[in-house]
C-alpha cells in the first residue's frame, strides 16, 4: 500500500463529494425521547439516543459541546483542508426526534448552522437564509433526521 499526498486536487474519499455537493453533519444535543427508550437505541448519557459515542460525527459534536455553529464551522474547514468542494453543502441534522426538541432550539440549530456557512451572525433565521443565497458556502439541501415514534 502506498501513501497519497492529499491536496485540493486530490481529495480524501472523493466519492463523498463526486456529485459536487458536500454532506456536512450537525448533531443535536442529547435528549431522552418523549416516548421512552427503544430497545434498538444504544444511546447513552452523553450521546443522542439513537447513536453511540463511536461515530465520527458524534465524537466531533461531543468535543464541541454539541454547538451547531462550531460543528459546522470546524467541519467546513476540515472538508476544505481535505480538498472537498465547500461551495454547495447538504446540511444533515442528526440526533433523533428533531420535532421533540423545543421549537426555539430547532430554529437555533438551523440558524447557527447557516451563520457558520455564511461566516457572519444573522439576527434571525430568515436573514441567515437570505444571506446564504449568495454565500461562499451555500446550503443546497437539508436533511433533518426525525423518528416517527
Label the model's feature ranges.
Residues 42:
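Cys/His-coordinated zinc-binding microdomains
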Residues 77-149:
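Conserved SAM/AdoMet-binding glycine-rich loop
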Residues 1-37, 45-68, 73, 77-79, ...:
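N-terminal [4Fe-4S]-dependent radical SAM core
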Amino acid at each position: 500500500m502506498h501513501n497519497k499526498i492529499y491536496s485540493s486536487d486530490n481529495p480524501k474519499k472523493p466519492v463523498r463529494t463526486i456529485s459536487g455537493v458536500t454532506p456536512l453533519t450537525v448533531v443535536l444535543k442529547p435528549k431522552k425521547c418523549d416516548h421512552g427508550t427503544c430497545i434498538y437505541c444504544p444511546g447513552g448519557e452523553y450521546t443522542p439516543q439513537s447513536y453511540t459515542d463511536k461515530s465520527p460525527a458524534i465524537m466531533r459534536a461531543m468535543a464541541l459541546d454539541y454547538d451547531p455553529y462550531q460543528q459546522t464551522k470546524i467541519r467546513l474547514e476540515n472538508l476544505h483542508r481535505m480538498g472537498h468542494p465547500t461551495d454547495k453543502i447538504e446540511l444533515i441534522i442528526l440526533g433523533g426526534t428533531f420535532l421533540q426538541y423545543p421549537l426555539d432550539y430547532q430554529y437555533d440549530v438551523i440558524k447557527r448552522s447557516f451563520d457558520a456557512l455564511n461566516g457572519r451572525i444573522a439576527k434571525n433565521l430568515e436573514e441567515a437564509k437570505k444571506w446564504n443565497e449568495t454565500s461562499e458556502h451555500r446550503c443546497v439541501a437539508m436533511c433533518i433526521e426525525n423518528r416517527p415514534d
